Amino acid sequence: MKNKIGISAGLLSGLFWGLGLTISAYIFSLYNVSPFAVAVIHDFISIFVLLAIILVKYKKVNFRIFTNIKSISVIIGALLAGPIGMQCNLYAVKYIGSGLTSSITAIYPAVSVILAVIFLKNKVSSKTIIGIVLIIVGIFIQSYKSEQVESFYLGFMFALICAIAWGSESVLSSYAMKNNLNELETLLIRQVTSFLAYLVIISFNGLGIETSLDVKFGGLIVFFVVSNMVSYILYYMAINRLEPAKATGLNVSYVVWTIIFSMIFVGLAVNVQLVVTSLIIILGVYVIVREE
């Protein structure tokens, strides 16, 4: 039962993350706002959403989790996956383009596997490894574009750091949850840390909002936050029940969901490569799920 709940949570986390990405792309197409401004607003609202959920479920909020030394792994994971990963991703796109960046950062599930085996002593089955390899191959082919770049090695370095940062989050969060932190508490620490870090960044760079905002923007932001928060909660449930390797492999199905939602809501054009690579990714997810 625990594994079935974890698998369902992992798959649904990908669905809601894909929906969130589609909404964010729509926001950026309509409004001239920086990703960091949206990230700050997102994290700020998500903190109160989490506090409300925790109060409803547990009747109180244990703020001592923020001073517990065992929470340090979540804080490190939040900094790696949030501001550091995001900055490196943006620099990689700047130097080598979005296609190559997406292809390189697609290895982050493999990073989770390696780190989980080394630091958590997790045993990873051959089917999980095969599934993750299929997913990475599918994403790589789907996003790769032959681009002439002058600063390839610099861009490659930033993309690789981004993949390592993203892959580290699930392992560090898993470690924290093995030390008596539940999923909601772990996620609350993550969001508070991420918000404060982004706040520092925009204090130096500015908020980056160069357009007038309206009620529609507010509605889209709320929809975006809700989608992402549902995804985060489900993802952390999957990490806690399945171990980082399998949870990451299921979560990365967001790539396919993003394509589906983009086709429905923004009219994304479909080609043979997109269909074939999506099927490869789905096959990889199926292999991971069928292990049970």
Name each region found by the language model.
Residues I27, V38, H42, A92, ...:
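Hydrophobic/aromatic residues within transmembrane alpha-helices
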Residues G20, Y58-G99, I141, V222-L242:
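Specific transmembrane alpha-helical segments of multi-pass solute transporters/efflux pumps
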Residues L50, L115, V124-Y144, V252, ...:
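Hydrophobic transmembrane alpha-helices of multi-pass small-molecule transport proteins
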Residues L12-G14, I41, G82, M86, ...:
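Helix-helix packing/entry segments at the starts of transmembrane helices
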Residues M1-V40, Q148-Y175:
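Glycine-/small-residue-enriched transmembrane alpha-helix faces in small-molecule transporters
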Residues Y31-I84, A165-E169, L187-G206, V222, ...:
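Transmembrane alpha-helices of multi-pass small-molecule transport proteins
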Residues I54, N89, P109-V133, V256-V275:
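C-terminal transmembrane-helix exit sites in multi-pass transporters
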Residues Y26, S46-T67, V137-E150, S194-K216, ...:
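Membrane-interface helix-cap regions at the ends of transmembrane helices
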